[in-house]
């Protein structure tokens, strides 16, 4: 394929993670060093920044600050939850994107996000092909939910899993100091896939953690749940439970759904308040001391507990997206595949068609969940343990983390 010269845009979308900026660094640094990419732009708040022509000139940033992106949590360029309509129904946004691309001679578009972001990538790529504008579009994976289809795991997941396991080990210590027992219910993110909540099993396996784990891969039954909690509490004098925010009844309704009717830009229910709800029910049923804990945003931005493996792989994903695009590849998402070399975990990249990834979800294999549907098996531990290895090389100022400070100079 012939060499394509032009500018590139990197955008971030969806929920932030501890390592999404590491992927942005991988894209930006590789693009700045490429002889084919003439200018590197960062879209403010994802695709909305493209639509509004608010693009940061990344060549104006201090290289040292760009390096710090690898250890800076959240989305440094700004994120969004903006659903693109089908261009056959309404192509207004697509015409605007094409206009902005032409203005800045954008020939490479990299979008860093999860399921919905890959859908956006796919739609933009197909539209550009339809109108005959050459632009290579690549998806860079990101989601703490770990539910992107076709990839062994997703950047961001391992760091969140490590944070969850560590936090539950600490909560366990706190909950066991008194002479009166406590029932502790910890709510963890995950609407349809329980990868994050399952990570709580690491705390139990390698220290002290939950006695019971409930995932959205199986139907939740309140009576069975209460019986499980009462059994453990009676046997041990205490009980710790990890629950996914997305646990649901057999009819598909979320246990926490009655607490809120809010939705995001993609129509997904805004879940939350499950721990408090279950704690109230358990307290009424048992009369025991019960505490509900919601990890909330902390589990996705804990850069101080990030996995160095996760950081390195996130950079690798961004770098691979640029290298493959410059080589002539388009319409793909960078994915990970796992290998074992001399008994050690090795991660390599592969490419998946965007059409195979967009709007599909990967859930925990049912065979990794125990028969009682209140815990996970060793297969899951074997899967996740290599991913959380290594400590982040955080720079510090006055013993506090020094995160990247971008100038964010808007392109003209």
Task: Please identify what each model-predicted range represents.
Residues 1-2, 52-107, 116-117, 155, ...:
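Glycine-rich oxoanion-binding loops at beta->alpha junctions
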Residues 2-54:
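N-terminal phosphate-binding or glycine-rich loops at protein starts, especially the Walker A/P-loop
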Residues 4-10, 69-83, 142-152, 179-182, ...:
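Gly-rich Lys/Arg/Thr-decorated short loops/hinges at beta-loop-alpha junctions or inter-strand turns
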Residues 257-412:
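C-terminal non-catalytic interaction/assembly regions of soluble proteins
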Residues 17-27, 50-51, 93-95, 115-123, ...:
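Short glycine/serine/threonine-rich phosphate/pyrophosphate-binding segments
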Residues 13-15, 43-48, 81-82, 114-115, ...:
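Short, ordered loop/turn segments at secondary-structure junctions
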Residues 100, 108-113, 119-134, 138, ...:
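Accessory alpha-helical/coil subdomains and C-terminal extensions
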